[in-house]
Design a protein with these regions (language model features):
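Short, acidic Ser/Thr/Gly-rich low-complexity loop/linker segments typical of extracellular
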Residues: 7-24
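Short pre-active-site segment immediately N-terminal to the catalytic Zn-binding motif
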Residues: 167-183
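Short, ordered, surface-exposed loop/turn motifs in non-cytosolic proteins
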Residues: 1-10, 32, 286
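Short Pro-Gly-centered beta-turn/loop motif in secreted/extracellular proteins
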Residues: 26-36
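Zn2+-dependent metallopeptidase catalytic core
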Residues: 28-30, 49, 85-134
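Catalytic zinc-binding patch centered on the HExxH motif and its immediate surroundings
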Residues: 133-164, 177-178
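Structured interaction patches on ligand/partner-binding surfaces of diverse proteins
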Residues: 44-86
Length: 328
């Protein structure tokens, strides 16, 4: 869960805890004490399993995002104190008119779902730290200058002296904090980079394009992972004026333009069909995430060849001999 802190009148931390999966928390402080609650946009667990995921504001010196509640007196009896991270959206104005406190926690919510998928198959996993940078000033650009919000696009970035995820937040242009598939897609790239291996060239790509096989695999993998983590094969990405437009596609769709190993749609449809348990008339394999995770973090990561669909699927067929014909 996220970190919840009790602060005294001087801003010092007098108690700290973490929320459970439902957002519940418990803190013990002295009676009749002035207290302010602060919720930090971070999920941290030391030991095994372990992880450290933090949302920061790249336009504010990478300050950790947090929600600060109102001050209250702890009294002499147990209290229930609920905090709400507001979206900042005013329906009547069709605009954000106040602080967008919910954004960082919406991002962490998708990270949480993605993490659960990993823990289901790797319950003792120790996952490398990840910093997720989000700001309402983050906008599409042609250059990368995160200090002022120029992040090109929502992306998992390795280079420019950074290694982490950057998320768009520009109102009426492109906001991605609530686009769970987009966040999970980039988390898939994090998994490739930190738990496995990627030889992707990066750069521009579309779901219909003929691509370098390394790029096609990386993007197709992350599309498929997003559907697995979110639990929905319909990929959705909102954008535009009042965030009213959307780009969508179904990763389970096997009718693909430019079908082949050089096409990310081909890759994501194959991987998702291996994973899912829904027989759609094309696939009958329901292997779940385990074999795919094992492959991504072992033989695919160690291949002497460049990473592509060919460095994962053949070994999956070896591990799933009863499904070889279905995979083909």
């Amino acid at each position: 869960g996220v970190t919840v802190e009790a602060l005294d009148g001087g801003g010092g931390v007098i108690a700290s805890s973490a929320t459970d999966s439902s957002g519940n928390y418990a803190l013990t402080v002295s009676p009749q004490t002035g207290v302010t609650l602060r919720v930090r946009a971070e999920m941290i667990r030391a030991g095994t399993p372990g992880w450290k995921f933090r949302v920061v504001d790249n336009t504010d010196g990478d300050a950790l995002s947090a929600l600060l509640g109102s001050s209250f007196d702890s009294g002499t009896e147990d209290l229930i104190v609920n905090l709400n991270a507001g979206s900042g959206w005013e329906p009547s104005a069709q605009a954000y008119t106040s602080t967008r406190s919910a954004g960082p926690f919406a991002i962490l919510d998708t990270v949480y779902d993605s993490l659960q998928l990993l823990l289901e198959v790797d319950p003792d996993g120790v996952f490398p730290g990840l910093v997720l940078s989000w700001s309402p000033l983050n906008r599409p650009s042609t250059t990368f200058d995160p200090d002022v919000g120029d992040i090109i696009s929502t992306a998992y970035v390795v280079g420019f002296g950074v290694r982490g995820m950057f998320v768009l937040g520009a109102e009426d242009v492109d906001t991605d904090e609530y686009d769970a598939h987009v966040i999970a897609h980039e988390f898939g790239h994090y998994m490739e980079d930190r738990l496995g291996r990627t030889d992707s060239t990066g750069g521009f790509h579309t779901i219909t394009a003929r691509l370098d096989p390394r790029l096609a695999f990386s993007e197709g993998w992350s599309n498929a992972f997003s559907a697995m983590a979110v639990g929905d094969p319909l990929y959705k990405d909102s954008r535009g004026l009042v965030q009213a437009l959307a780009f969508t596609f179904n990763v389970e769709n096997n009718t693909v333009i430019n079908q082949g190993w050089y096409n990310e749609s081909s890759v994501h449809s194959v991987l998702y069909d291996i994973f899912d348990d829904a027989a759609d008339g094309v696939d009958a394999t329901a292997a779940g995430f385990g074999p795919i995770y094992e492959g991504m973090t072992t033989w695919h990561a160690r291949t002497e060849a460049l990473t592509s669909i060919f460095s994962l699927v053949p070994e999956l067929k070896n591990r799933l001999p009863a499904d070889t014909a279905n995979i083909d």
